Amino acid sequence: MMTNLFSVFDPSSSIFNLSLNWMSTFLGLLLIPSAYWLMPSRWHIFWNSILMTLHKEFKTLLGPSGHSGSTFIFVSLFSLILFNNFMGLFPYIFTSTSHLTLTLTLALPLWLCFMLYGWINHTQHMFTHLVPQGTPAVLMPFMVCIETISNIIRPGTLAVRLAANMIAGHLLLTLLGNTGPSLSFMIVSILLIGQIALLVLESAVAIIQSYVFAVLSTLYSSEVN
Amino acid sequence: MPQMAPIGWLSLFIIFSLTFILFSMMNYYSTIPQSPKSQILKKSQTNSMNWKW
């Protein structure tokens, strides 16, 4: 029964049994303004203002140890996840970020790189990070244990948080919609209004989740140095 | 799951990493960072003359 419930997520856009669903990941690439022209258009200015706001925010988060250009990867990570999340809300477009394949692909290499760099180059610093500031001496062994575990599950939580948030919204909308044909006209209009409200919530969640992912990876990277 | 069968996870991993790199490239080339503008604008002396060769 569980596979049946989630089978609404099996997309049917397949040509010659070759599933082209994952091509929706590239949709965001078409929406980012291209840099062919000298004078910025309105879309250019809008996108640039978003990126610059994010850049200032991440630079603050990274603190004094951030090098020039260190916010760049997180800003582009935000844009990738934002477009994938948001495009998935439109009908017939596959939400690639709702699958662990994509989210783990993004989270695991990032976390692994931070950990390898930190542990190999700044071993002392990484060890001191295992004990937060101001813990009583009695609690230190337990804090080390807890911090180690929380460190290890970080890529998992990053990936699963994004995928689960995306799936939850879509699942709710689908379940509500599946009851539609068996209802009277009045209740169907209430259902539609509810679904539209949920769609607005989902668009907010899409933007927020992409922001959370980017901010958390910024924080994880700032802990290393 | 049917859409996971033809392409394996490794190729999907490579595709998504390349997509991330492509996104990074697009964002890098389309950002126009603001250089800090000076507060005092030095306006040099301009004589308005009629245009001639």
Curated annotation (Swiss-Prot), chain B:
Q: Name one GO cellular component term.
A: mitochondrial membrane
Q: Which UniProt keywords apply?
A: ATP synthesis, CF(0), Hydrogen ion transport, Ion transport, Membrane, Mitochondrion, Transmembrane, Transmembrane helix, Transport
InterPro entries, per this entry?
ATP8_metazoa
Q: Could you list the residue ranges forming a coiled coil in this record?
A: none
Indicate the transmembrane segments per the record.
6-26
One GO MF term, please? proton transmembrane transporter activity
Q: Is Phosphoprotein a UniProt keyword of this protein?
A: no
Q: What's the chief localization of this chain?
A: mitochondrion
Q: Where in the cell is it found?
A: Mitochondrion membrane
Into which family does the record put it?
Answer: Belongs to the ATPase protein 8 family.
Its job? Mitochondrial membrane ATP synthase (F(1)F(0) ATP synthase or Complex V) produces ATP from ADP in the presence of a proton gradient across the membrane which is generated by electron transport complexes of the respiratory chain. F-type ATPases consist of two structural domains, F(1) - containing the extramembraneous catalytic core and F(0) - containing the membrane proton channel, linked together by a central stalk and a peripheral stalk. During catalysis, ATP synthesis in the catalytic domain of F(1) is coupled via a rotary mechanism of the central stalk subunits to proton translocation.
Q: Per its record, how is this protein called by name?
A: ATP synthase protein 8
Instruction: Tell me what gene encodes this.
Output: mt:ATPase8
